[in-house]
Amino acid sequence: MPEKTIVVLPGDHVGTEITAEAIKVLKAIEEVKPEIKFNFQHHLIGGAAIDATGVPLPDDALEASKKADAVLLGAVGGPKWGTGAVRPEQGLLKIRKELNLYANLRPCNFASESLLDLSPIKAEVVKGTDFVVVRELVGGIYFGERKEDDGSGVASDTETYSVPEVQRITRMAAFMALQHNPPLPIWSLDKANVLASSRLWRKVVTETIEKEFPQLTVQHQLIDSAAMILIKYPTQLNGIVITSNMFGDIISDEASVIPGSLGLLPSASLASLPDSNKAFGLYEPCHGSAPDLPANKVNPIATILSAAMMLKLSLDLYEEGVAVETAVKQVLDAGIRTGDLKGTNSTTEVGDAVAEAVKKILA
């Protein structure tokens, strides 16, 4: 089996700690499966890159990422770098655009049923919640034409979507739905009662599913209505949820409170359909860099589960990815948890426990 090259971009603050724990788990796989070899290449991104090079994404980091099988990212940003002309988050936007990472996948479920009581929503309401937000990541208002206030007292941002952009994200959602038997339902979220871009979105999603995936069902929901359903009846959205860049950013962050901690939720950003389990992708936790958190207190589970997604979708190591997810469930069920989950364990203790569990599962 050829060596798998993983570019590691720790980023800022807790980013270094959480990527270290994910690497620990990946090395545990190497230990019990000698035929599997990972080549980890570390590079700078975000505030750490600004401090060292003056730019949030150095050329060497971008070039290495383009040549890798996958990218594992920690977290970027922090108050130290403020909101000036050069910001850590620009590194993230640039790498997404340069690597054409057009689809962001964010699962929302419970890594373990033992966590149900930690949700801020009643356990009986959230039990069984299981959906994936498929967010369009390189179009829409975040990448549209913008005009800063130049002293005139007026600023603007432009939301633009084209037919091909909506078609390819719809195909990604359809592919994800078809990985299940029976296929999962698709929910498309927009603001078609107000926005022209949303009316195009709704039309193209409908046409693409009807013409290319007649075996699938798609239901359209206005984003504000969906935001209410997500809290009141989250299981109604079970399946695949597809939406635009900004709406996906907001709704996936809202969904992240359901399992009780951002420290549990992974994400994948893909440049193509994972139809061969070898799609190029960037994997990162849904949480930020947590600059106020003391050392060894951050929950590494989201990053470890991001590595599990990487194994399944980019590295053609599906069995090993499932083993990591199973190990996480075992560790959480055993009560080994960080403070955000009402536990007393450190970052490294949780990582150690998952690594040991993975070894036992794969041995």
Swiss-Prot record:
Q: Give start-end ranges for the coiled-coil region(s).
A: none
Its organism's taxonomic lineage begins at:
Eukaryota, Fungi, Dikarya, Ascomycota, Saccharomycotina
Q: Which GO terms describe its molecular function?
A: 3-isopropylmalate dehydrogenase activity; magnesium ion binding; NAD binding
The main location class comes to cytoplasm
Which reactions fall under this protein's catalytic activity?
Answer: (2R,3S)-3-isopropylmalate + NAD(+) = 4-methyl-2-oxopentanoate + CO2 + NADH
* Gene3D superfamilies in alphabetical order: Isopropylmalate Dehydrogenase
Q: Which organism is it from?
A: Cyberlindnera jadinii (Torula yeast)
The record describes its quaternary structure and partners as: Homodimer.
**Where on this chain does substrate bind?**
R96, R106, R135, D224
**One Pfam family, short name:** Iso_dh
Q: Which cofactor does it need?
A: Mg(2+); Mn(2+)
**Which EC number applies?**
1.1.1.85
Give the pathway annotation.
Amino-acid biosynthesis; L-leucine biosynthesis; L-leucine from 3-methyl-2-oxobutanoate: step 3/4
| Protein name from the UniProt record | 3-isopropylmalate dehydrogenase
Q: Which GO terms describe its cellular component?
A: cytosol
Q: Which residues take part in binding Mg(2+)?
A: D224, D249, D253
Q: Which UniProt keywords apply?
A: Amino-acid biosynthesis, Branched-chain amino acid biosynthesis, Cytoplasm, Leucine biosynthesis, Magnesium, Manganese, Metal-binding, NAD, Oxidoreductase
Source organism, top-level taxon: Eukaryota
Site described as Important for catalysis, located at: Y142, K191
Keyword Glycosyltransferase in record:
no
Q: Which gene carries the instructions for this protein?
A: LEU2
Cellular compartment(s): Cytoplasm
